[in-house]
Amino acid sequence: MAKIERFYDTFQPEHYDVYVDVDRAKKTIVGETTITGTATQSEISVNQKYLVIDEVIADGKPVEFKTDNDAEAVRITLPNEGKVELRIKYHTDLTDTLMGIYPSYYELNGKKQQIIGTQFETTFARQAFPCVDEPEAKATFSLAIKFDEKPGETILANMPEDHEAGGIHYFEPTVKMSTYLVAFAFGDLQSKLTTTDSGVKVGVFATKAHKADELDFALDIAKRAIEFYEDFYQTPYPLPHSWQLALPDFSAGAMENWGLITYREAYLLLDPNNTPLDTKELVATVITHELAHQWFGDLVTMKWWDDLWLNESFANMMEYVSVDALNPEWNVWELFQMSDVPAALNRDATDGVQSVHVAVNNPAEIDSLFDGAIVYAKGARMLVMVRALIGDKALREGLKNYFAAHKFGNSTGADLWKALGDASGINVGEIMKSWLDQPGYPVVTASVNDAGQLVLKQQQFFIGGGEDKGRTWQIPLNGNYGTPQIMKGKKLNLGDYKALRTENGEPFRLNVGNNSHFIVQYDDKLLKDILQHADQLDPISKRQLLQDSQLLASAQRLSYADLIPLLVEFANDESVAVISVLYRIANSLKQFVIAESPEEQELREFFGNLSRKQVKRLDWTPKATDSNDDQLVRPYVLNASLYAHDAVSIAQAHELFEDNDDDLTQIPAAVRGLVLKNEVLNFSSKGLFDKLMKAYHETVDPSFKQDICMAVPNVTDPELVKSLVNDFENADVIKPQDLRAWYRGVLANEESQQFAWDWIRNEWSWLEATVGGDMEFATFITVTANVFHTPERLAEFNAFFDPKVDTPGLTREIKMDKKLITGKVDLVEKEKTAVNDAVAKEV
């Protein structure tokens, strides 16, 4: 297994002059990179991948070199150590891998067009130009770009253009930065521009296939977010401009290239007249996430990839801090509780999960660090925990000092904890060590013992079994009975329960606000007290009660059947924080029934009972008077009514479809996906299938594309399913960036599942060649494991993935997902009778 060499140890670049000549028609790249730096020995290496090195010149004289493709390097022999100017000439192909320099395709007026963009994180700058491609190897960069330019085309880069001469566009030198943040793009683009109060130019760029007003929302959010961050961080934005660019083909969600942030179109552009609130919230949080990186990740960067969480966890928290300040009426912290928190709690409960801080020993493992549920979601939750501990005043002061101390340089987690600790007077590093370096999280049991004492105990929580290694965490308890701020040991006695209950006058609860990364299991006495006063709980506390209960049931620490009465209790709550988790639990009940069985029929009736009052209250037509919660709750209850085969819902959705049959984009976007799903489920035909796939191909509206992607995989006609699966490998129909969503949709449909499962097994080599370098490649395995829950599928999963378990970057995912499916199989076997009996009692 290849080990990672640190080329920075022997060669420290200071400045790059990067010349690149891109010919789109010939699909070629010719380049020349001049690196000024210091060699600490005569034998040095710089990174390259897929580059053909033509010549290496050191201080004006050709020198010996050897290309080492296994190490993604070019080995160079210098006359002596010390200051050196390296000039490296090379050429390579322009490929469609979505990494390095690559073309991005779209249609305009029926003709296929392309723009060129870049994606260099994690280690893909080396596919564009020779460099020391390590985060610590910060340098300045002067870009000179030539391309087969057509009149009216736009070229963008990290810094403003200085001048153009001989068809070459020369850009101002960058500030000191890491290679993975270098970016440029060119093509036929439209834009909208503004300027912040402090003078930073802000722009949004997209292809001309989009309507101009689709750029407006992003421009407003970006401008206000930069102004917010400059104030919150008390540190100026360090560059002259901040460009936001939507690329038609993009592997990640977005990328924080300094001064030129790139996005999937779905995460930047939206129709201001017909976009649901949840999509606006999503786009806003993606933009503010990337802009948070301009300081945290770009200005100050982790030394090595094992501290990736420093970048991503912090940006993940700050996206909510900023959007909450920009649009407080959205209550966006509820979105955090609905997305990041459950993602972290579920993933982090599987034995074998990575810790937030994890060592990297193999180049192929770097991309596997981007575990969204851990590095992003759990890490953000850790920082939310810290914020709650120290408060915003200390947080802002600590960050100001942190940026001042490390700007244009690198840092570690210890540097951040020190800055926050100095500002708050709290030893943040000591508290956070257990959360950063240990995988998993604790369940805290709260019980009244025989002596009447209220006792807390902590132990690691597992779903699907796990090896208890006696881990403990320093837990911010956030109790409502004056509990200690931090629980350090395995056991804590809080005193006489009766006296505490009388003194406090309310049920005992821990983790109030749900900011700390643990769950609580109350004994029967304490839980009964909470449920008797459930109407006094705020939405987050109700959500927390439901969420913790499901996790405990999934771990078989309580019966899954005990969740059924809780669903009935909270079914008519009007908060999306509650309803979203309620239907998450309700949908999980489907694993306990066989399709079209009497048990499933009873489950459908149960869904009808849960959703009936809410459907009547909200119906299928969004109204101007809808509250934010109404807008967000509606899709959950309408989807439930469709599963219930509710005749009124089916008819109303069908009517909306027919009323807009000539232009499906005019269906209210808040319900459009469900309207289309209803057609596929209940009025399916080849004509409908062809109509929707044609619309998918022709539209540039990302929201409409997602609605079609949600609906079409519900098709059951075998010939239509075959046709759809065949298009998985046709990039003109389904772009590789969107393939996972289509695969998941077909796999989740029991009647078409076999087609998708056969496809991924038969076409694994194609999938690996197409998206194998993508940081989300392993999530195709995750998606599969999230769907499977039967012994037969577990056996097939093991048979296919066991031989791949030693593949770098896939090992952890395969091992964890085997445990995940095994746990579900065991749960269903043990609980299905009790669950189905409990459902039957409610119908």
Predicted regions and their residues:
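A surface-exposed beta-strand-loop module
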Residues: 48-107, 129-130, 496-503
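N-terminal, polar/Ser/Thr-rich
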Residues: 1-32, 54-59, 98-102, 109-115, ...
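Extended, low-hydrophobicity, Ser/Thr/Pro/Gly-biased non-transmembrane segments
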Residues: 89-192, 216-217, 360, 517-519, ...
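Aromatic/His-enriched, Gly/Pro-containing loop or helix-boundary segments
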Residues: 62-79, 117-119, 123-126, 265-286
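Surface-exposed beta-strand/loop patches in extracellular or lumenal glycoproteins
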Residues: 34-51, 133, 142-148, 461-476
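Short, well-ordered beta-strand segments enriched in hydrophobic/aromatic residues
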Residues: 29-37, 453-458
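Hydrophobic alpha-helical and helix-loop surface patches within well-folded domains
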Residues: 53, 171, 204-467, 598-609, ...
